[in-house]
UniProtKB/Swiss-Prot annotation:
Keywords: CBS domain, GMP biosynthesis, Metal-binding, NAD, Oxidoreductase, Potassium, Purine biosynthesis, Repeat. The gene is guaB. This is Inosine-5'-monophosphate dehydrogenase. Coiled coil: none annotated. The keyword Coiled coil does not apply. Catalyzes the conversion of inosine 5'-phosphate (IMP) to xanthosine 5'-phosphate (XMP), the first committed and rate-limiting step in the de novo synthesis of guanine nucleotides, and therefore plays an important role in the regulation of cell growth. The active site is at 301 (thioimidate intermediate). NAD(+) binds at residues 244, 294-296. It comes from Nitrosopumilus maritimus (strain SCM1).
Amino acid sequence: MEFKEGLTFDDVLLVPKYSDITSRSQTDLTTKLSRNITINIPFVSANMDTVTESSMAVAMARAGGIGIIHRFLTIQEQANEVLKVKRSGSVMIENPYSISSDKSIQDALDYAEDKEISGLLVVDSNSKLVGIVTERDLLFAGSNGTIADVMTKDVVTAKPGVSLDEAKDILHKHRIEKLPIVDDSGIIQGLITSKDITNNTDYPNASKDKKGRPLVGAAVGVKGDFLERSESLLNAGADVLVVDIAHGHSENAISTVRNIKKAFPDCELIAGNIATAQGAEDLIKAGVDAVKVGVGSGSICITRVITGSGVPQLTAVMDCAKIGNDHGIPIISDGGTRTSGDATKALAAGASSVMVGSMLGGTDESPGTVLTKNGKRFKVYRGMASLAASIGRKSKETGSISLEDDLNDYVAEGVEAMVPYKGTVTDILKQLAGGVRSGLSYCGAHTIPQMQQNAEFIKMSRAGFAESQPHDVLLM
């Protein structure tokens, strides 16, 4: 039996090359997420229930990346998370939330809380705009009475086709924050808010769809409701779907890809996880638009320990990237990234983007509450193949769990852990992107594709790795 050498990020360094780059701002981190989707920084937040829901996905898109909403929600809950992202940054909300004027004030309060919005357009029985109700109107109104009693009736509106500059002038002139767009019949066609205009200005590097809304992806499984879930997510506005399975080089994954592509041929579809060239080849033949690479490399993954299977991440990326390049299909490196240097190595090895989980877990935008232990703050971070995640998933799917059966039947390939509380994800993404920009400059590259052409790896010993770390000093 022949043994192949497998290397990961800590086994190698990139050899510095001549660079004509005088400032990191001269580098361009634009890259392909999938066949037809471009993002402005090469980072994707992992589809994990302790990493990505709408708050994380919004932050990722504003920074120029993309978030993948995890699938361990009901179909409607997951679709709502996608909708929240799309509504968070659209210059014009196409289907703004509205409520009938004869509904109670309590109905408006409940609806606004459920949708996490600050105001509602008010319509009559013919769906024509008759008013607007905001938090200010409802603040001291109590719960009795109808919306018609408290709404603002004299609403400033604009016609379809109004330009952004015209909308800004109208909002400023009338000192208002919301501008409904109505046609000649009084039917609502959209809504422009001052907040959305501000967001459009404040995040110039944001990744957006053709309508100017934040990019967002969502994960689906390979069993049960995956087609129904896919349809709901696409209808909600998901830009890309991710077929999410631990062993992506399997008939379950391949048949799911084919079925989704058959039902939704225009859907951008990512699938994984795989770790070999043949796995990439088979998924690409099935119709994927990007391949997610990484088996057992994540910080909370114990697949390699439990099953004995896996490929060191750098070798896996390099092997799969050769196949991806042959077919024009991007590769996503998923797992094992602990530093911006690791991300740079993954990109240099052929990945078009890097999926990150543990680095983003513990941030304000990740789901979950902050815990305090021994005077320090943490958040829970768990693998999606952990027992806790499996039980949570089954509870969502069936509405009940049998702990005895779950413990007997399930073999965990992930663990549940705590990661330090890190504050906002924005700062982490700035550091990651800045590190990769510096990495490009050391490789004499202005772009990620140019770095992949220039890249030269050198294998290092454990002594070389130790030399690469801070040493012979007492860290403060």
